[in-house]
Amino acid sequence: LLSAYDVWDHDRFEWSDVLSFQYGMRGYCGLDVDMVREVLNKANGEFVSDMIRNGEAIIEYIIEKNRGEMKMFSFEADIFGYKAICMNTTEFNSTTFESMYDPRKHDLMMPFCWNGRFFRCSFYTTKEEVDVSALARKANPGGGGHKAAAGFQLSVEDMMEFLKSKEM
């Protein structure tokens, strides 16, 4: 199940089990690779089932946490003519935005956070016609990525201007 997550293999297992097992193992082992190896060498069907159940609970918690944070801290902005939903967060993935992102209203999602030197920013989209890698390069020439997911950096001054105007 762990390897299916690493390569986004949706065919061999039920994807909800893959995600739940992944989160259950993260909760059990953290990021300790040696512990993961040791645990998996002893794992049996009951252990796998327990990890899936634990992972389901963790995922439910994350969904509720994201929903609350999006409700309190997200805002809409204009990004080079596209409608975006934005939030200051350390959770850099599109699932953070699931409770508020509406493809009928929004073209992209933009998480951002301060890392002590600059603002780290990402763009995500579900729309085929939007190329967020081009938008990331437009925001900062060093930015880029894939058509549906990209990143870039902003200075304090540029971020403050964006936050004041809600436009980029």
Describe the predicted segments one by one:
Residues 60-168:
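Gly/His-enriched, cation/cofactor- and phosphate-binding structural elements
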Residues 6-11, 17, 32-34, 50, ...:
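Acidic-enriched, low-complexity/disordered segments with a strong bias for Aspartate over Glutamate
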Residues 1, 17-20, 35-38, 46-58, ...:
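Exposed alpha-helical structural elements
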Residues 1-43:
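Internal, active-site/partner-interface "lid" segment
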Residues 29-77:
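Electropositive nucleic-acid-contacting surfaces
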